[in-house]
C-alpha cells in the first residue's frame, strides 16, 4: 500500500529499472514482413524467433505467442491436462486443486493458475536469492502431499536454486513450470534458464533483456505439447478445410511484425547482458 509521507520523495530524474535498447537491424525484419505482406501470425520472422528461442534455452521446441502471460497460461493448461486429463467444457484443468507458487513475483506468474481454476499456495522466499525457498517447498509438500504442480519465477533474472527446486518437484512427482520471463541468458551451473522446467516461458515485453514491445515463447522438449500449445493459440482450430473446433482455444499467436523486432534483437542478447553486468558492478563498487 502506498503511504504518502515526507520520508518518500520522488527522484528528480526517474531511474528506470529496465528500458528497451534498440539497434536498427530490427527494422530490416519488420520491413521484410511488410514487403512480403506477411503481416499476420505466420511468416519467416516467427519461424526464426522460435528457432532462436529454443537454441538459446537449450530445448527442442519453442512456440511464439502474443505474451509471456499467454505462454504461462498454456504451460499451466498443458500441465493440468497432463496431470488430471481434459476437463469438461466450462471448467479449468486445475479446478479446486492447490498449486505451489512463488510469492515474490509479478501477478502474471499466478494469474494462469487462477484462469484454470487452481488455488495458488504461496511458498516463502529465500532471503539470499529472493526466489522460492527449497526448504519452504519441502515443508509445503509435507503439509499438502497431493500437490502435483509448482510454478517457479526467476525474479529479476536470477535463477535461485532452481536445480534443487527441480529435484524436489521430481521427488514428489510434481510438474515444474519455470517462469523465465526475466531470466533469458541466465545460467545455473552452466545450464540455461528456460530448460529446467517441464514447461517454461520467456518474455519479450518492453522491460525485458531483449524486446519486441510484447510477446513471449513457450519452451518444451515434447513435440506433441508444442503442437498442442500452437493449436490452442490459434483458437484450437482443427486441421480441416472449414472452421472446425473441438476444444476451447485462444487468440494467442505472435504477429510476424512483432517477431521481426524480436528477431533483430537476438544477436544483441550477449551485449545487453554484458551491459547489465557492468551496471551491477558499478552499483556494487559504489556500495
Task: Go through each PLM region and give its residues.
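N-terminal "arm"/small-domain region of PLP-dependent enzymes with the aminotransferase-like
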Residues: 1-40
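Active-site region of PLP-dependent enzymes
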Residues: 34, 183-189, 196-287
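Hydrophobic/aromatic ligand-binding patch that stacks against planar heteroaromatic rings
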Residues: 111-113, 168, 257
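Conserved coil-to-alpha-helix start sites within the AMP-binding
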Residues: 104-110
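Short beta->alpha connector loops at strand-helix junctions that form conserved
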Residues: 103, 121-126
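Active-site phosphate-binding strand-loop segment of PLP-dependent enzymes
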Residues: 128-212, 218-219, 224
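Phosphate-binding glycine-rich loop
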Residues: 42-98, 112-115, 122-124, 191
Amino acid at each position: 500500500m502506498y503511504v504518502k509521507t515526507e520520508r518518500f520523495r520522488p527522484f528528480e530524474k526517474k531511474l528506470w529499472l529496465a528500458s528497451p535498447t534498440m539497434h536498427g537491424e530490427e527494422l530490416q525484419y519488420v520491413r521484410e514482413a511488410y514487403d512480403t505482406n506477411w503481416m499476420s501470425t505466420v511468416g519467416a520472422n516467427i519461424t526464426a524467433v522460435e528457432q532462436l528461442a529454443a537454441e538459446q534455452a537449450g530445448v527442442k521446441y519453442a512456440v511464439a505467442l502474443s505474451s509471456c502471460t499467454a505462454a504461462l497460461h498454456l504451460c499451466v493448461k498443458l500441465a493440468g491436462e497432463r496431470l488430471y486429463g481434459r476437463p469438461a467444457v466450462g471448467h479449468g484443468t486445475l479446478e479446486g486443486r492447490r498449486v505451489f507458487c512463488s510469492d515474490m513475483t509479478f501477478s502474471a506468474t499466478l494469474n494462469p493458475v487462477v484462469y484454470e481454476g487452481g488455488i495458488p499456495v504461496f511458498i516463502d522466499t529465500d532471503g539470499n536469492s529472493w526466489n522460492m525457498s527449497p526448504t519452504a517447498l519441502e515443508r509445503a509438500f509435507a503439509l499438502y502431499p497431493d500437490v502435483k504442480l509448482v510454478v517457479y519465477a526467476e525474479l529479476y533474472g536470477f535463477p535461485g536454486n532452481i536445480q534443487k527446486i527441480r529435484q524436489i518437484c521430481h521427488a514428489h512427482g510434481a510438474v515444474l513450470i519455470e517462469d523465465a520471463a526475466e531470466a533469458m541468458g541466465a545460467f545455473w551451473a552452466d545450464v540455461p534458464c528456460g530448460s529446467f522446467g517441464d514447461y517454461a516461458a520467456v518474455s519479450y515485453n518492453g522491460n525485458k533483456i531483449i524486446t519486441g514491445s510484447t510477446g513471449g515463447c513457450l519452451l518444451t522438449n515434447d513435440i506433441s505439447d508444442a503442437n498442442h500449445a500452437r493449436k490452442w493459440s490459434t483458437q484450437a482450430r482443427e486441421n480441416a478445410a472449414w472452421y472446425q473446433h473441438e476444444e476451447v482455444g485462444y487468440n494467442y499467436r505472435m504477429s510476424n511484425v512483432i517477431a521481426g523486432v524480436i528477431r533483430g534483437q537476438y544477436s544483441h542478447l550477449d551485449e545487453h547482458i554484458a551491459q547489465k553486468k557492468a551496471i551491477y558492478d558499478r552499483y556494487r563498487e559504489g556500495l
